[in-house]
């Protein structure tokens, strides 16, 4: 098993001032452990109208700085916030890149992430026929820029609609995405 440690933006109400210090301590204690593989999942989530963008940005930058300092890749949650995430990554220039979890952006955003050393995580959402823009974007990208992920038990693929998602579905997801 491998571990990544981070403070997710969907739980902003639960994060406290001391959490960044605690995260820094956790990472420092595990830096020599090869099972500590990344900082994450963290990022920006602008989906809700009540999203505190300033607080999220501060938490995002603090964790990105930890990733840079620890020389660890980042697992990033990005929802309706690609422009801000890309701009921030350009300022910090993390040497290890990482993965954009559940990528849903444009071809231009995909290219920017690639330049910054990030791969794009794809899973069940990309198998849905109504995900037209995402499917068109995937078709334009080189396979080595993509990473399969399940986000189990959530984000089930179209062929397994309204059921619990599972890593066992990855071969079929890969087949469907390869056909694009």
Where are these regions (language model features)?
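His/Asp/Glu-enriched short active-site or ligand-binding loop at hydrolase and phosphoryl-transfer sites
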Residues: 117-131
């Amino acid at each position: 098993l491998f571990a990544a440690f981070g403070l997710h933006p969907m739980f902003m109400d639960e994060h406290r001032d001391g959490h960044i210090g605690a995260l820094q301590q956790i990472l420092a204690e595990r830096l020599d452990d090869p099972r500590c593989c990344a900082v994450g999942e963290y990022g920006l989530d602008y989906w809700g109208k009540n999203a505190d963008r300033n607080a999220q940005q501060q938490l995002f930058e603090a964790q990105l700085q930890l990733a840079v300092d620890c020389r660890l890749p980042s697992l990033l949650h990005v929802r309706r916030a690609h422009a801000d995430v890309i701009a921030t990554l350009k300022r910090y220039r993390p040497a290890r890149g990482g993965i954009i979890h559940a990528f849903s952006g444009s071809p231009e955003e995909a290219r920017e992430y690639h330049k910054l050393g990030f791969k794009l995580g794809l899973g069940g959402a990309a198998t849905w026929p109504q995900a037209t823009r995402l499917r068109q974007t995937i078709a334009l990208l080189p396979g080595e820029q993509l990473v399969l992920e399940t986000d189990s038990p959530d984000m089930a693929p179209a062929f397994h609609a309204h059921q619990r998602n599972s890593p066992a579905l990855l071969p079929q997801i890969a087949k469907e995405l390869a056909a694009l």
